[in-house]
Amino acid sequence: MFALVLAVVILPLWTTANKSYVTPTPATRSIGHMSALLREYSDRNMSLKLEAFYPTGFDEELIKSLHWGNDRKHVFLVIVKVNPTTHEGDVGLVIFPKYLLSPYHFKAEHRAPFPAGRFGFLSHPVTPDVSFFDSSFAPYLTTQHLVAFTTFPPNPLVWHLERAETAATAERPFGVSLLPARPTVPKNTILEHKAHFATWDALARHTFFSAEAIITNSTLRIHVPLFGSVWPIRYWATGSVLLTSDSGRVEVNIGVGFMSSLISLSSGPPIELIVVPHTVKLNAVTSDTTWFQLNPPGPDPGPSYRVYLLGRGLDMNFSKHATVDICAYPEESLDYRYHLSMAHTEALRMTTKADQHDINEESYYHIAARIATSIFALSEMGRTTEYFLLDEIVDVQYQLKFLNYILMRIGAGAHPNTISGTSDLIFADPSQLHDELSLLFGQVKPANVDYFISYDEARDQLKTAYALSRGQDHVNALSLARRVIMSIYKGLLVKQNLNATERQALFFASMILLNFREGLENSSRVLDGRTTLLLMTSMCTAAHATQAALNIQEGLAYLNPSKHMFTIPNVYSPCMGSLRTDLTEEIHVMNLLSAIPTRPGLNEVLHTQLDESEIFDAAFKTMMIFTTWTAKDLHILHTHVPEVFTCQDAAARNGEYVLILPAVQGHSYVITRNKPQRGLVYSLADVDVYNPISVVYLSRDTCVSEHGVIETVALPHPDNLKECLYCGSVFLRYLTTGAIMDIIIIDSKDTERQLAAMGNSTIPPFNPDMHGDDSKAVLLFPNGTVVTLLGFERRQAIRMSGQYLGASLGGAFLAVVGFGIIGWMLCGNSRLREYNKIPLT
């Protein structure tokens, strides 16, 4: 086992022209020989890796043997890796200019030496004259590059990468632009100096503000590339973004014409994507002994930028095709929407192959690079046009938060509690915007809290609240999110699909109510989450799942990233926020396949591009998106339904539950096809034995298993009662094949009346006439009672025994006869007959 010992010797080389060489030891010969080879390159920065044997200490004679004649320009850095037992190991020589010993400090100018919008006036960001005593030089003294490993591929011939077909050209220097086109500043408009919320109208209309801050507030910084493998870069910084988790990290530094994106993953080595103006050449730190200086790996410069990719030196698992793709990203477009659209597409496709413990390495690097490039593109677009829009800032902030969560949880396999992200962009102050937004929400009048004007307005407000939230949301934002979800739920009871605006509003409402970090002990927030999960699961009926899957397939089939932006909120479905994991079962996949012909355009695209097996595979993967999104998010489950994890129950963690339904606090219904280990267990009858359905009522305080009996009774009709008798109960429809079809929460008296209407119900799952004989239904009560739903009694009858009923009827009959005789005697035929006296004797 090697121990790492770093011995750094820094010596100026002095003239020893009249002094003889000392007889070298084996180590001296090796080092002296290599120093002689490098003598002629004394004006250049070089580094060298060599094998050698050497004594345990460095004495004066050894140091003197390293002289270079009259050369006074260089110093040696000797880095030693030694085995303490054999005293054998490696020596690395790193040679630096002597003038680095003279401290030199950059003087930051008051403003960047170039105006906005002028690429030709960009300051050269690369500097070779970094002070040896500057803190940015430390990585070069302790670098592992060329000592423990190499950051670059060993063969420089493969460093040159082909320019991708999607990269910018002279005819398209800024790449593609999406529709609608970016708004331009109207004439005579006075630009605000910074982004801020004055009124809610700022969201509905385009609000412009100046990009002058990029010029006046940028600061001069020095960037040390990955492992000190490239000489330092000086640039004017305009912002940074940091995305972290326990298994991944993305660090983005943005400057004027500059970007560095360091992307690392616990399961693989890091990479760094560097973007500089097209005239800039970076110098790699290499062991090369040729006359010319090598540039880091990357394609040829484009019309505006040059891209370099560092890392993955000895790792051949990262394909060259993927490398070329990533290098093309910064030049594909300066429209930030394009890169975010591609990130959403990759994220959606990643969920089709994800498991809760998987790491999707290639997707992780692609999405992270897209996120970084989108920030760079927005910064450069604002600088070149000299303005930004408020909705661009809100859009980017929400995208960073959402994509970071998906990137780390699904891409890196991170624990959700460890996921965090911060942004420090010079052209936007999230803290200030958050305070202004809170002020606007605080001005909402109580009379207006019970409704919202439109889904468009609600979407914009919730999007901004989600984007600028700092862990705790304003009470009125939470109230708006609840109302949006309930309104959409009521609408989906009678229809199967949502329009794009409704999907977007639902997405932001659910994100606000389900994803929060602070206030976990707040019972009202947990209750919000349980209610949201129950409503989302209720909206995810079998019919809606089919339509939602068709929406996703259409979104991907018609995807044209060079024209229109694609985002996950545009195709969001309640199924993505539900706790159903059964939608990949055969019946649901087949329902999707049978529904494809109802959308002729999609049907034509699929059958033109795919064969039958590929179409089936695509349908299966589409349904998998629903099961991966929330149902396997252990953070959400632990936070909102902790009772499924008590008693050391690993069923939820292992994905054994096909459905989870939060009931009253501390209790939940779960459906499983395995033998339950605890809870009140109801086994549904007349179900395929190979696909059984066990409904289990779990309590956080109960660790034993008990079998329950499903009651089969006609339930009282709710029209006879003013109160909602069945509110809080869940209607469950299933097939005798074992397939779960619909789960609907009875939320109000109106929904209860629809349930009791049976064959006259306008809610399709409630109407038995719309389903076959193999369709069955049960009602799950909040207290753990399960009843087979046969029908409802119109009026409540008085229960009496048979003997009592017979005696009552007999007595009534005799009374009627008696009263009839008396009446007949008193009143019968008095007008037709005369009364005769009884004769006397």
Swiss-Prot record:
Record topology, Virion surface segments: 18-802
Interaction with gL as annotated region, ranges: 246-309
Record's protein name: Envelope glycoprotein H
Residues annotated as signal peptide: 1-17
Main function: The heterodimer glycoprotein H-glycoprotein L is required for the fusion of viral and plasma membranes leading to virus entry into the host cell. Following initial binding to host receptor, membrane fusion is mediated by the fusion machinery composed of gB and the heterodimer gH/gL. May also be involved in the fusion between the virion envelope and the outer nuclear membrane during virion morphogenesis.
BP GO annotations: fusion of virus membrane with host plasma membrane; symbiont entry into host cell
An example Gene Ontology CC term for this record: host cell plasma membrane
Quaternary structure (record): Interacts with glycoprotein L (gL); this interaction is necessary for the correct processing and cell surface expression of gH. The heterodimer gH/gL seems to interact with gB trimers during fusion.
Keywords recorded for this protein, A-Z: Fusion of virus membrane with host cell membrane, Fusion of virus membrane with host membrane, Glycoprotein, Host cell membrane, Host endosome, Host membrane, Membrane, Sialic acid, Signal, Transmembrane, Transmembrane helix, Viral envelope protein, Viral penetration into host cytoplasm, Virion, Virus entry into host cell
UniProt-annotated glycosylation sites, renumbered to this chain: N18, N45, N217, N317, N499, N522, N760, N783
Intravirion side: 824-841
Family indicated by similarity: Belongs to the herpesviridae glycoprotein H family.
Membrane topology, record value: Single-pass type I membrane protein
TM annotation in the entry: 803-823
Species of origin: Varicella-zoster virus (strain Dumas)
Keyword flag Transmembrane: yes
Lineage of the species this protein comes from: Viruses, Duplodnaviria, Heunggongvirae, Peploviricota, Herviviricetes
Maturation and modification: N-glycosylated, O-glycosylated, and sialylated.
Subcellular location: Virion membrane; Host cell membrane; Host endosome membrane
Predominant place of localization: virion
